[in-house]
């Protein structure tokens, strides 16, 4: 019975597609991050994040495409931070973060193609292969920090990028942050104005 229920309930190979975040350096401690403000604009589907690090204010907008496995972000900072793309091996567990950082020999991340504004990474682990397409606006350099760890370093104080996960190399046009933002805004506007929402705020 347990085997049958697990067939429905358990992912046989729980897979973390990757960590995307700011490359702030190992010397940064949680206490160094001050004035944290984060809010979700539910009408447009945008997360607005603000914080201060070493007296430098950061403002990040993050949005998800409604139909593709794609996120986009806009970073504003006087001292630009790198964007990290860090890929773990799955743990196979059920109640953890699915990240095994001690198994770099069991999976690989290779740079398939690159130009001045985009790059494609190929992820291979066991029998699974998927692709990570990164595109950006403005000058930036993508470098391999270590195995399964890439950093995109911009030079401008305002920087935007998109990242898409696909089972094959994507043949679709690469979208900009603005295009993803517009797609998200249109999707959520339609959701809130055309969908049905039950209001229980007056219930006692």
Task: Write out the residue ranges for each language-model feature.
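Acidic/polar, glycine-enriched structural segments that form the non-catalytic walls/loops
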Residues: 1-204
């Amino acid at each position: 019975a347990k085997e049958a229920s697990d067939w429905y309930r358990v992912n046989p190979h729980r897979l973390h597609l990757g960590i995307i975040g700011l490359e702030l350096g190992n010397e940064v401690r949680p206490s160094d991050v001050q004035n944290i403000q984060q809010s979700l604009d539910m009408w447009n589907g945008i997360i607005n994040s603000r914080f201060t690090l070493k007296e430098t204010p950061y403002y990040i907008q993050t949005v998800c495409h409604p139909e593709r496995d794609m996120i986009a972000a806009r970073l504003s900072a006087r001292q630009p931070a790198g964007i990290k793309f860090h890929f773990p091996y799955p743990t196979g567990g059920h109640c953890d973060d699915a990240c095994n950082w001690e198994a770099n020999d069991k999976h690989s991340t290779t740079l398939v193609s690159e130009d001045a504004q985009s790059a494609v990474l190929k992820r291979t682990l066991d029998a699974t292969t998927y692709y990570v397409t990164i595109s950006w606006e403005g000058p930036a350099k993508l470098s391999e920090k270590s195995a399964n760890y890439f950093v995109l370093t911009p030079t401008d104080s305002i920087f935007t990028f998109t990242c898409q996960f696909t089972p094959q190399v994507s043949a679709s046009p690469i979208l900009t942050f603005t295009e993803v933002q517009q797609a998200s805004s249109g999707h959520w506007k339609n959701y809130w104005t055309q969908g049905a929402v039950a209001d229980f705020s007056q219930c006692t």
